[in-house]
């Protein structure tokens, strides 16, 4: 059966109109023009299943659409067994792309609903499936503006995007509906960088600033912790010497992380925060920038064992 998948990229604005769309990966395009999908949305199938309100909102948004064919599915009985599951797999793939957009810059782009239309010869004779996610990503500052991406910024995200393998989606996780916890388990080969990404995503989906900071701190611990003593001091020191280029920048980074951990300590122990809202915003934004730089660079030291990491940072400290 042939298919078309559509999902809105909420809060995303492109600097130019892209009617046909720009290819993200084979079969998938990002667009902000209605011409690409008008043949889909202006049909009775869409009106009766998706509804006119949702249809019109997609036309006026930035969205992703994916065209292809399920070579292993030939009739509605087969499609009904896996339709929702495959809708989730497409939706998770686009959510994965939003993480690449974050690597370009801080933003509040997210996906919620995805629609899959499956058909044989004629679209009107097809069937509709829907999947929904709950992660609403926000700016590190929690500002409420749209995120505008230039052509060069979009190109950077697309060039660096590596689609998830089909092996990531199976019956056990229902096409990605149920997140996999293996990345957190040591006996499943958990890796520092993947855990850091996990908590960074948690920070981006937090709507309360102190919770963002807690998750950002967890992400830093995933990358830098090698023991249980003086954790926050070691992390502040290691962030400073790894990213700082001058005495002043190293000092500022050290103070940023120390301040973040003061907020984190009060938050996780249920205390009232002794902070002004503007201070929380500055720290949250600073941590977001730090993690973006660390994750994008993906230094080889983060794949080393604890002793090798300790030796690396000791050498860096006294170099």
Predicted regions and their residues:
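Composition- and surface-driven signal marking solvent-exposed, interaction-prone regions
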Residues: 216, 232-237, 273, 277-284
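Charged/polar positions within long, soluble alpha-helices
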Residues: 228, 265-273, 295-303
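Short runs of predominantly hydrophobic/aromatic residues within well-ordered alpha helices
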Residues: 193-196, 212-216, 220, 232, ...
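Flexible secondary-structure boundary motifs
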Residues: 214-251
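Histidine-centered, metal-coordinating catalytic motifs and their short helical/loop contexts
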Residues: 251-279
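Short alpha-helical scaffolding segments that buttress acidic/His motifs in well-ordered protein cores
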Residues: 196, 200, 217-220, 239, ...
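Glycine- and acidic
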Residues: 198-204, 244-247, 272-277
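Charged, non-catalytic interaction/linker regions at domain boundaries
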Residues: 1-211, 280-282, 288-289, 294-318
């Amino acid at each position: 059966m042939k298919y078309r998948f559509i999902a809105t990229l909420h809060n995303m604005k492109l600097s130019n109109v892209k009617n046909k769309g720009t290819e993200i990966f084979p079969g998938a395009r990002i667009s902000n023009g209605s011409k690409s999908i008008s043949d889909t949305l202006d049909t009775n199938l869409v009106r009766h299943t998706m509804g006119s309100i949702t249809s019109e909102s997609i036309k006026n948004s930035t969205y992703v659409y994916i065209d292809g064919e399920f070579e292993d599915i030939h009739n509605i009985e087969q499609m009904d067994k896996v339709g929702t599951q495959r809708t989730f797999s497409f939706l998770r793939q686009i959510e994965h792309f939003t993480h690449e957009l974050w690597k370009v810059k801080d933003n509040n782009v997210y996906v919620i609903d995805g629609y899959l239309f499956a058909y044989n010869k004629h679209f009107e004779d097809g069937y509709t499936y829907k999947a929904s996610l709950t992660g609403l990503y926000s700016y590190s500052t929690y500002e409420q503006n749209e995120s505008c991406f230039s052509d060069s910024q979009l190109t950077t995200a697309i060039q660096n995007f590596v689609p998830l393998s089909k092996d990531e989606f199976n019956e056990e996780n229902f096409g990605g509906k149920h997140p996999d916890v293996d990345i957190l388990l040591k006996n499943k080969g958990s890796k520092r960088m993947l855990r850091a990404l996990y908590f960074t995503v948690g920070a981006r989906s937090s709507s309360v600033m102190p919770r963002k900071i807690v998750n950002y701190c967890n992400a830093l611990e995933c990358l830098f912790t090698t023991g249980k003593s003086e954790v926050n001091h070691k992390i502040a020191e290691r962030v400073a010497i790894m990213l700082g280029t001058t005495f002043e920048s190293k000092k500022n980074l050290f103070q940023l992380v120390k301040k973040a951990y003061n907020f984190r300590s009060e938050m996780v122990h249920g205390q009232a925060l002794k902070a002004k809202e503007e201070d929380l915003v500055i720290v949250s934004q600073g941590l977001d920038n730090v993690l973006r730089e660390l994750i994008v660079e993906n230094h080889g030291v983060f794949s080393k064992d604890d002793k090798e990491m300790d030796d690396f940072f000791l050498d860096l400290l006294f170099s």
